[in-house]
């Protein structure tokens, strides 16, 4: 299988670092919801996310990458960012996930679950449905965008631009989004 769609749910309201609440994968056309509070051995997940033969489809991944770095001490690769692909294909700069889904499927996703408490257990049926659909849409649209980028000879641009997110320093300053704005002491 050449693609896996990847997303995370986390909370960051009252912490400096995000608290991972759920990992969502769409792999081999099936959606998997992985509860980090219930599973301690994540080696097989980390192996899949590190497998260079599998393209990780992801939308606007900066916060997700921070989650993976803190939680699994790794960065998934190779990555294909659907938000960057949309921009490079001229279909919208900085387009959000909901807008992308509506553009490609006509479906309108509720915003309600995005702000729900993902750390509270048990997760509700609505949360579980939302989380599974999240990566199902991402997989479908991501594959379509990947193929379109390949067809228009822009795939290398997206992959290169997305790969830049995974490089750089690993220290605290590199992880702090606006560190470059701070005045030195």
Located regions from the model:
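DEDD superfamily 3′-5′ metal-dependent exonuclease/proofreading module
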Residues: 1-185
């Amino acid at each position: 299988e050449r693609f896996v769609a990847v997303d995370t749910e986390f909370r960051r309201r009252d912490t400096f670092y995000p608290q991972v609440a759920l990992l969502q994968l769409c792999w081999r056309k099936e959606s998997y919801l992985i509860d980090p509070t219930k599973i301690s051995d994540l080696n097989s997940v980390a192996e899949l996310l590190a497998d260079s033969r599998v393209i990780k489809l992801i939308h606007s991944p900066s916060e997700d990458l921070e989650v993976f770095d803190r939680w699994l001490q790794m960065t998934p690769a190779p990555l294909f960012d659907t938000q960057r692909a949309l921009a490079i294909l001229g279909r919208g700069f900085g387009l959000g996930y909901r807008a992308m889904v509506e553009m490609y499927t006509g479906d309108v996703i509720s915003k309600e679950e995005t702000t729900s408490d993902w750390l509270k257990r048990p997760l509700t049926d609505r949360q579980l449905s939302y989380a599974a659909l999240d990566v199902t849409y991402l997989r479908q649209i991501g594959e379509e965008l990947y193929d379109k980028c390949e067809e228009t000879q822009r795939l290398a641009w997206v992959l290169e631009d997305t790969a830049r997110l995974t490089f750089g320093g690993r220290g605290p300053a590199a992880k702090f989004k606006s560190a470059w704005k701070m005045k030195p002491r």
